[in-house]
Amino acid sequence: MAASISGYTFSSVCYHSANSNSDHEGFLLGEVRQEETLNISDSHIGSSEFLSVIEVHNHEPCAQLFSFYDYAGNINEENLDRILKDRRKNVIGWYRFRRNTQQQMSFREQVIHKQLTNILGIPDLVFLLFSFISTANSSTHALEYVLFRPNRNRYNQRISLSIPNLGNTSQQEYKVSSVPNTSKNYASVIKEHGTEFFDKDGVMKDIRAIFQVYSALQERVQAVCGEVDQSERVREKIQEEVNKLKEEIALRKRNSAEEERRIQEAAAETHPDSSTLPESSHSSLTGVVLSGPTAEPSLERPVNSSSPPIYSTALPPDSPSAILLPRPQAVGSPGHPSPSLGLGNGDGSSSDSLNRQATGQEDHEEDDDDDEDEDSSEYENLVSEQLQPTSLPDAVALGRPATLWPDGDAHSPPGS
């Protein structure tokens, strides 16, 4: 069993006791309630325990000592009813204030307490004892209190008394304990105007309306919770399908990449020489072009630009036919090759382009050199044909650089 007293009741009793000239006594008003305490252990096994709590809400002081009993401890019920009146059903105990005494119940107090328990019909009647102690020089004053619950076996059983707003306590004690208002004036005002604010059950009308709104909100919240739960389940299913589709797409990409790689490897194994053939032909053409004279061409243009390149520069120095090659011929001479052959000049330009650029210089020089060129070319050609009739084309093919045609491509001479 435990006991609790409100802060203003405790302060009122202490104030009345400290300002009195002698000892005094009175009655404690309140109620007894059952409080259930749940204890949950680490093994998730809960156990409930019921605790009886005595709550003191108010007090009723007596005018003087021995107001409802005599010196022998006999109680006068008429005087007791005159003091308590209609609050007799709210009595849960009585109290006594003594000065400079020990915190023990006297024999008279024990007799009075036993009679009050029988008259009021309260088996759990309690007794609150206040003692005021001060030093000789009045420098220190101490107010002590103790709560007793006398019974048949032991009269000095002490009960812990707690004050909700005294000490380092939590605010939950205010929610658990409710202190009713026992004022007569408050009761008369509520009785007169209570019909406007309270219904027949004593509950405020606004409170009932608030509870109705609260219930409606709770129903709506429960409905929304069901919808949210269903939508979350649908979302989880859709998310699973999306994840499966992503995995399938990634698998298809990997398979397609592997298939393309296999096709490329198979193509490379089937045609291994196809890629190397153009490179070899290109390198051969490049080799022919680069096999020409290494000397840089002269930037000065010769007087007779229509003459073909000198064969002595194209043939190797040790060629036996180098001394028998004809010297450059003029355009139109019988021994000069046709411009359509597109012989190169050694610097990458064709003879046709040079002929067209130097046309103005050729016209006034052709007449002077025609007779002389014809005689010399016929004689030299005759001598070369008698000495080496078949070695001239081979020599030209070996020593002549690749011919550049007007389209810019390099061509090897015929017979190469």
From Swiss-Prot:
Sequence segments annotated as region (Important for interaction with brcc3 and other subunits of the BRISC complex): 221-242
Coiled coil start-end: 228-262
Gene Ontology biological-process annotations: attachment of spindle microtubules to kinetochore; cell division; mitotic spindle assembly
Record-annotated MPN domain positions: 3-149
Signal peptide: none
Region (Disordered): 254-416
GO cellular component: cytoplasm; microtubule; nucleus; spindle pole
Modified sites of kind Phosphoserine: 377
Oligomeric and partner information: Component of the BRISC complex, at least composed of abraxas2, brcc3, babam1 and babam2. Interacts with brcc3; the interaction is direct and may form a heterotetramer.
Family assignment from sequence similarity: Belongs to the FAM175 family. Abro1 subfamily.
Entry protein name: BRISC complex subunit abraxas 2
